[in-house]
């Protein structure tokens, strides 16, 4: 992948860009194998890869510059702004949207937030596109609601220019810190969820719910989890840290008793909407802390699926999984190092199968799916 920003030295986010892509996959696989070298792995599967450019469905843009000439991109530590509108990780559909949004910022008088001076209102633009419908979700991250009336008044022009905008909201983030969003979300459109679809499974994205940024590889990840789980012929499962329900909804058959747990109420609303669309009758999605739910629950499912944040599932949940002893644990991880530490705390389980998913080309990061079977 050629990137003018990388060549110019203005953006080095893709730290492995100069490394040939086959070598990237080899290095990631070797890293994963080294982390699990102390455990026997019955089956190592080949890494799954997708497109090397234009694969992202989401842009997180710092807004800087002036209201007349805004920049969308990132800030270096010294405060230097870099416009990332031409980043080759974004699909071709993003560039014209960025152009319109720059005009809109000026038209609506949304002064970019100046970090050094602690002045201005518009901090970030967050853009997500559905590969299923082409619809787009747009979030304005503001320091306060001072410019909210101006934003609302100018929106009809923006919606006329970009009819693909289905979900628009404003997020209020008042803190002078590099935090992407605050707790308060203000819907600006009647529609509040963007529909996506992977492998004929409808999924919904709300403003404050997490969703994978590489749809092509994410669809492969979910499909692989589905195939592994259905081969086990189970009839009950937990999906912990379930997000919008992607894993559980892929794996569940109509008769499967599925419990999905996620701390985010927004994500749970999405999961419930998907389950309703699919007509699944034996599904229960709840907005709870996954560890607290598991350790307080009396029943034992046949399979527990975990998809934790980068920190992993931790000692408390590992200890409880050892105690409750489900037949299978399916572990999906965005941080193989924390996953390896967790697996060390699951001595009663053997590693049946491992597969790497290259969700983040040109970086050292990747996702991994591991099937653990009770001894």
Swiss-Prot record:
* Its EC number(s): 2.1.1.189
Q: Entry's PROSITE patterns?
A: SAM_MT_RNA_M5U, TRMA_1, TRMA_2
- Sorted alphabetically, which Pfam families does this protein's record hold? tRNA_U5-meth_tr (PF05958)
**Active-site residues annotated for this sequence:** 334 (nucleophile)
A Gene Ontology annotation in the biological process aspect, one of them, is:
rRNA base methylation
Domain of life per record: Bacteria
Keyword rRNA processing listed: yes
Q: Name one GO molecular function term.
A: 4 iron, 4 sulfur cluster binding
Say if the entry is tagged with keyword Signal.
no
Query: What CDD domains is this protein classified in?
Result: AdoMet_MTases
Sorted UniProt keywords: 4Fe-4S, Iron, Iron-sulfur, Metal-binding, Methyltransferase, rRNA processing, S-adenosyl-L-methionine, Transferase
Instruction: Give binding positions for S-adenosyl-L-methionine.
Output: 212, 241, 262, 307
Kindly list the positions annotated as binding [4Fe-4S] cluster: 3, 11, 14, 87
What this protein catalyses is: uridine(747) in 23S rRNA + S-adenosyl-L-methionine = 5-methyluridine(747) in 23S rRNA + S-adenosyl-L-homocysteine + H(+)
Q: What PANTHER family has UniProt attached to this entry?
A: RNA M5U METHYLTRANSFERASE (PTHR11061), TRNA (URACIL(54)-C(5))-METHYLTRANSFERASE (PTHR11061:SF30)
What family is reported? Belongs to the class I-like SAM-binding methyltransferase superfamily. RNA M5U methyltransferase family. RlmC subfamily.
HAMAP family per record: 23SrRNA_methyltr_RlmC
Q: What is the role of this chain?
A: Catalyzes the formation of 5-methyl-uridine at position 747 (m5U747) in 23S rRNA.
The name this protein carries in UniProt is 23S rRNA (uracil(747)-C(5))-methyltransferase RlmC
- Gene it is expressed from: rlmC
């Amino acid at each position: 992948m050629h990137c003018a920003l990388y060549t110019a030295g203005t953006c080095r986010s893709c730290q492995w860009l100069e490394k040939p892509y086959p070598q990237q996959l080899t290095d990631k696989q070797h890293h994963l194998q080294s982390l699990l070298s102390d455990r026997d792995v019955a089956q190592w599967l080949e890494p799954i890869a997708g497109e090397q450019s234009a694969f992202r469905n989401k842009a997180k843009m710092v807004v800087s510059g002036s209201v007349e000439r805004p920049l969308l991109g990132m800030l270096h530590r010294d405060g230097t702004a870099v416009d990332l509108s031409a980043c080759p990780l974004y699909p071709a559909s993003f560039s014209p949207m960025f152009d319109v949004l720059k005009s809109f910022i000026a038209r609506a008088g949304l002064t970019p937030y100046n970090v050094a001076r602690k002045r201005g209102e518009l901090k970030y633009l967050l853009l997500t596109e559905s590969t299923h419908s082409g619809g787009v979700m747009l979030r304005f991250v503001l320091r306060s609601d001072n410019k909210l009336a101006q934003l609302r008044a100018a929106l009809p022009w923006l919606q006329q220019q970009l009819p693909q905008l289905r979900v628009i909201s404003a997020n209020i983030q008042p803190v002078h810190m590099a935090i992407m969003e605050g707790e308060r979300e203000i819907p600006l459109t009647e529609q509040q969820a963007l529909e996506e679809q992977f492998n004929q499974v409808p999924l919904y994205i709300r403003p404050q719910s997490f969703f994978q940024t590489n749809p092509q590889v994410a669809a492969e990840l979910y499909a692989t989890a589905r195939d592994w789980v259905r081969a086990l012929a189970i009839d009950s499962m937990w999906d912990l840290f379930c997000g919008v329900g992607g894993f559980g909804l892929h794996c569940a058959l109509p008769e499967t008793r599925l419990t999905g747990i996620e701390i985010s109420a927004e994500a749970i609303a999405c999961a419930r909407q998907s389950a309703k669309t699919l007509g699944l009758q034996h599904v229960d999605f709840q907005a709870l802390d996954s560890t607290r739910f598991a350790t307080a629950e009396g029943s034992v499912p046949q399979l527990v699926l975990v998809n934790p944040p980068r920190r992993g599932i931790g000692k408390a949940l590992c200890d409880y999984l050892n105690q409750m002893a489900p037949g299978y644990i399916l572990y999906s991880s965005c941080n193989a190092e924390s996953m390896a530490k967790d697996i060390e705390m699951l001595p009663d389980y053997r590693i049946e199968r491992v597969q790497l998913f290259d969700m983040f080309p040109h970086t050292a990061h990747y996702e991994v799916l591991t099937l653990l079977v009770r001894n």
